[in-house]
Swiss-Prot record:
NAD(+) binds at residues 219-285. The gene is XYL1. It comes from Scheffersomyces shehatae. This is NAD(P)H-dependent D-xylose reductase. PROSITE patterns: ALDOKETO_REDUCTASE_1, ALDOKETO_REDUCTASE_2, ALDOKETO_REDUCTASE_3. Its EC number is 1.1.1.307. Pathway: Carbohydrate metabolism; D-xylose degradation.
């Protein structure tokens, strides 16, 4: 039996984006193609990737295999990628996008986000790709004076050229959204942010939704992904999977903690992009829409908010995006 369709959000440009996607961050290159292919077979249609993840070739292979086998068409797949920090200069934006399109083996991406509001020094693709934190000077961070609006204007041109269907931003605070609105011709369709019970960001999410921007949550399970990276802050934070509040709500609804965490975001009108290597979890992570959290559940989860951010550029080089 075919998997049931995933509900979609209508973006402010009229296009539809699945409300549940498959996150490609930290997908191992040796297994990424198979994982993406299996996720498509399990009913996933949105794949959230990025230049910085270093696995877009493999993601593209998984998508291509599914298309070649007739499981899906390109039009049924929603591919998200993100412009990395080294490519913010308008003259480098299309170069970076073309690399993504080549790696994904497609003519366009459905959504292209500015990954962070940070402009590093340009590093040629042939020198190092993805460059990560490399700025051409050993371990030193080197920045370029590129206003966000200039980068945005370059993305708008690529929408008009047909290489991108929707554009948006990631890791932007409200003040930068306001600044972007002053000069943007195309409004951001999506805002992607870290979002979990320890970092609920209610005002930012309320504002984005009020002005017609769809919000996508990453790291819906809180410290989990960062524990796997041995991040000290995450290692010293109680896992949400074992938190008494989350476990009690899960038991009440006969669900597992992951389903509660994803359902909590969904009921806030937020898209989610979990990932899993396990086939049974692939199904579980996209089937949380069959129950409702109560007002009391929400009140209990809201008490867990401690404004604890795990993905903070301040940790890189004292970059003050969220201070």
């Amino acid at each position: 039996m075919s998997p049931s369709p995933i509900p979609a959000f209508k973006l402010n440009n009229g296009l539809e984006m699945p409300s549940i996607g498959f996150g490609c961050w930290k997908l191992d290159k040796s297994t990424a193609a198979d994982q993406v292919y299996n996720a498509i077979k399990a009913g996933y249609r949105l794949f959230d990737g990025a230049e910085d993840y270093g696995n877009e070739q493999e993601v593209g292979e998984g998508v291509k295999r599914a298309i070649d086998e007739g499981i899906v068409t390109r039009e049924e797949i929603f591919l998200t990628s993100k412009l990395w920090n080294n490519y913010h200069d308008p003259k480098n934006v299309e170069t970076a996008l073309n690399k993504t399109l080549k790696d994904l083996k497609v003519d366009y991406v459905d959504l292209f986000l500015i990954h962070f509001p940070i402009a590093f020094k340009f590093v040629p693709i042939e020198e190092k790709y993805p460059p990560g934190f490399y700025c051409g000077d050993g371990d030193n961070f080197v920045y370029e004076d590129v206003p966000i609006l200039e980068t945005w204007k370059a993305l708008e041109k690529l929408v008009k050229a047909g290489k991108i269907r929707s554009i948006g931003v990631s890791n932007f605070p409200g003040a930068l959204l306001l600044d972007l609105f002053r000069g943007a011709t195309i409004k951001p369709a999506v805002l992607q942010v870290e979002h979990h019970p320890y970092l609920q960001q209610p005002k930012l999410i309320e504002y984005a939704q009020k002005v017609g921007i769809t919000v996508t949550a990453y790291s819906s399970f809180g410290p989990q992904s960062f524990v796997e990276m041995n991040q000290g802050r995450a290692l010293n934070t109680p896992t949400l999977f074992e938190h008494d509040v989350i476990k009690a709500i899960a038991a009440k609804h006969n669900k597992v903690p992951a389903e509660v965490l994803l359902r909590w975001s969904a009921q806030r009108g937020i898209a989610v992009i979990p990932k899993s290597n396990l086939p049974e979890r692939l199904v579980q992570n996209r089937s949380f829409n069959d129950f409702e959290l109560t007002k009391e559940d929400f009140e209990e989860i809201s008490k867990l908010d401690i404004n604890l951010r795990f993905n903070d550029p301040w940790d890189w080089d004292n970059i003050p995006i969220f201070v």
